[in-house]
């Protein structure tokens, strides 16, 4: 399986991880054979385990975060982000002209904003949703991205910042 360290651990953007059940297959896939790349066989050389020769040190940032937070800290971070996402979606979902398209399963949910002028014209709701997202982002209070779900424009609520707190959620 694979996961993204950027989202949950707030490490550099290109820190993804793949957990492989068969080390020999993993090694064979990524091994770089060249005459000038010598191995003494005494220690694992990371260039044989990553897609690019230039990424050997990428794991240090992840190691530092895991060492600092520990398993309990990581668990608390993930649970807090999930709780904040749910609170934002549930709170916003109670506002007039707001429709919850997807409640968070983990840390992401989807909201749609219906044009208060009425009507069932989807394009008007799409436009209004885009306007609401632009206004929120322009305020600087929060940042959301637009998305499309089942042909409806919506606002993607995604919480993964370790500094996000209850006051941020309340203001949002």
What residue spans do the PLM features occupy?
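Conserved PLP-binding catalytic core of the aspartate aminotransferase-like
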Residues: 99-136
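A generic structural motif
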Residues: 7, 68-71, 115-117, 161-165
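Generic non-transmembrane alpha-helical segments
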Residues: 87, 91-95, 131-142
């Amino acid at each position: 399986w694979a996961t993204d360290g950027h989202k949950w651990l707030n490490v550099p953007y290109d820190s993804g991880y793949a957990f492989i059940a068969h080390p020999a297959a993993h090694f064979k896939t990524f091994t770089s054979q060249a005459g000038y790349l010598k191995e003494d066989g005494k220690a694992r050389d990371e260039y044989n385990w990553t897609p690019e020769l230039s990424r050997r040190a990428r794991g240090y940032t992840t190691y530092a975060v895991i060492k600092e937070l520990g398993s309990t800290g990581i668990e608390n971070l993930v649970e807090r982000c999930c709780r904040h996402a749910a609170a934002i979606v549930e709170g916003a979902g109670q506002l007039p002209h707001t429709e919850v398209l997807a409640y968070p399963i983990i840390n992401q949910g989807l909201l749609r904003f219906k044009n208060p002028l009425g009507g069932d014209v989807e394009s008007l709701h799409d436009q209004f949703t885009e306007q609401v997202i632009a206004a929120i982002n322009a305020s600087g209070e929060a940042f959301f991205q637009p998305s499309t779900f089942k042909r409806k424009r919506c606002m993607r609520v995604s919480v993964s910042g370790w500094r996000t707190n209850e006051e941020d959620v309340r203001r949002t």
